[in-house]
């Protein structure tokens, strides 16, 4: 909404047009806004969660160091999502269909995660929302969204899969392949980030790095000058540039959330945060046609999810034998004797390296 205000004010005050005309300025402003909103609302939110006794449930078979986390305020993801939506309404171009799609993704997956957390933490339902019901809701939404995105993106012929580190190699996709790929990316990312969110600050830093990386790609691909110079397919779909603005909002809010989520965590994001942030990253990757770059930058999430699948498969197929001491894999390292902070920081380092590899693919082609 503010861009319309600044556009009107620019007729009377010279220089204010930068806030409405330059997307780079709005990227900076929305990241600052989302950061400040999260910082401002963080303490009241934590106090309210404590008052309502909405606290973390800790598994008895987990690392002993986790017992101190019991009853730590959870569902802090509401803080992140609210900040992102408010910031987008303030600084986003509200005529962009892509911005509204991302807001809808936040609301839908946020509702699923909120209901799951509410069942577990408030109503004390042991397993929360049943996995099959959660998967069904995610799947229906993802398939419908993938079909919508196919028709939106195909208007400008942007239906090719971009191959990293290649100047001209693109794989064309029809609607079936596109929908299937988008389905697995959105659902897989949502659940992978959810599995990664098991230690203080572990998930939010990789989320911020991946959001920043995808935001950079979105900015380049929707800028004809940069896209031509760097030999990218120019994505000229009206409003698609707002994806970069949205990514900046996620980065700002995520960094502010880390202020409260760093060890020892004062609040956890819960399923309402992790499921939603994962889904949003997947949708963004599909929108900007950088699914493989997303795989590279988000490989930590893939490994976390894969460790769970391997553990479950091994347990069922090998008569109860396990590959890891505990899954997801970050718990395996804890049970090997690594302090929680060392596990988290080393995973952050890995995530940063993956981000840099994905970033290098912009020029090394």
From Swiss-Prot:
Its main location: membrane. It holds the Pfam family MraY_sig1. GO terms for biological process: cell division; cell wall organization; peptidoglycan biosynthetic process; regulation of cell shape. The chain crosses the membrane at residues 22-42, 74-94, 95-115, 134-154, 168-188, 201-221, 240-260, 267-287, 292-312, 342-362. Its cofactor is Mg(2+). GO terms for cellular component: plasma membrane. InterPro entries: Glycosyl_transferase_4, PNAcMuramoyl-5peptid_Trfase, PNAcMuramoyl-5peptid_Trfase_CS. Pathway: Cell wall biogenesis; peptidoglycan biosynthesis. Keywords: Cell cycle, Cell division, Cell inner membrane, Cell membrane, Cell shape, Cell wall biogenesis/degradation, Magnesium, Membrane, Metal-binding, Peptidoglycan synthesis, Transferase, Transmembrane, Transmembrane helix. Its EC number is 2.7.8.13. It is a multi-pass membrane protein. One of its GO terms (molecular function) is metal ion binding. It is an enzyme of class 2 (transferase). It catalyses: UDP-N-acetyl-alpha-D-muramoyl-L-alanyl-gamma-D-glutamyl-meso-2,6-diaminopimeloyl-D-alanyl-D-alanine + di-trans,octa-cis-undecaprenyl phosphate = di-trans,octa-cis-undecaprenyl diphospho-N-acetyl-alpha-D-muramoyl-L-alanyl-D-glutamyl-meso-2,6-diaminopimeloyl-D-alanyl-D-alanine + UMP. It is found in: Cell inner membrane. It comes from the Bacteria. CDD domains: GT_MraY. Catalyzes the initial step of the lipid cycle reactions in the biosynthesis of the cell wall peptidoglycan: transfers peptidoglycan precursor phospho-MurNAc-pentapeptide from UDP-MurNAc-pentapeptide onto the lipid carrier undecaprenyl phosphate, yielding undecaprenyl-pyrophosphoryl-MurNAc-pentapeptide, known as lipid I. Belongs to the glycosyltransferase 4 family. MraY subfamily. HAMAP family: MraY. This is Phospho-N-acetylmuramoyl-pentapeptide-transferase. The gene is mraY.
């Amino acid at each position: 909404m503010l861009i319309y205000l600044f556009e009107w004010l620019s007729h009377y005050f010279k220089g204010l047009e930068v806030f409405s005309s330059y997307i780079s300025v709005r990227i900076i402003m929305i990241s600052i806004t989302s950061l400040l909103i999260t910082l401002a609302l963080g303490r009241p939110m934590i106090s309210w969660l404590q008052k309502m006794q909405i606290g973390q449930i800790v598994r008895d078979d987990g690392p002993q160091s986790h017992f101190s986390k019991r009853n730590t305020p959870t569902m802090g993801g509401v803080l992140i999502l609210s900040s992102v939506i408010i910031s987008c309404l303030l600084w986003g171009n509200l005529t962009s269909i892509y911005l509204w799609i991302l807001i809808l993704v936040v609301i839908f997956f946020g509702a699923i995660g909120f209901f799951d957390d509410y069942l577990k933490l408030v109503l004390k339902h042991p397993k929360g929302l049943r996995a099959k019901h959660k998967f069904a809701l995610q799947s229906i939404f993802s398939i419908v969204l993938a079909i919508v995105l196919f028709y939106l993106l195909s208007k400008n012929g942007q239906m090719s899969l971009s191959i990293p580190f290649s100047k001209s190699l693109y794989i064309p996709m029809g609607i079936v392949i596109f929908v299937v790929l988008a389905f697995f990316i959105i659902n897989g990312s949502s659940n992978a980030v959810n599995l990664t969110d098991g230690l203080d600050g572990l998930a939010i830093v990789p989320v911020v790095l991946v959001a920043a990386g995808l935001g950079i790609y979105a900015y380049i691909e929707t800028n004809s000058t940069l896209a031509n110079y760097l030999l990218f397919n120019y994505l000229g779909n009206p409003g698609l540039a707002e994806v970069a603005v949205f990514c900046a909002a996620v980065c700002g809010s995520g960094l502010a959330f880390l202020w409260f989520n760093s060890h020892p965590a004062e609040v956890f994001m819960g399923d309402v945060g992790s499921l939603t942030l994962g889904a949003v990253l997947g949708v963004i990757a599909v929108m900007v046609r950088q699914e493989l770059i997303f795989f590279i930058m988000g490989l930590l999430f893939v490994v976390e999810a894969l460790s769970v699948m391997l553990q479950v498969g091994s347990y069922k197929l090998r008569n109860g034998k396990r590959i890891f001491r505990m899954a997801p894999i970050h718990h395996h390292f804890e049970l090997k004797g690594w302090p929680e902070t060392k596990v988290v920081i080393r995973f952050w380092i890995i995530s940063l390296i993956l981000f840099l590899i994905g970033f290098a693919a912009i020029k090394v082609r």
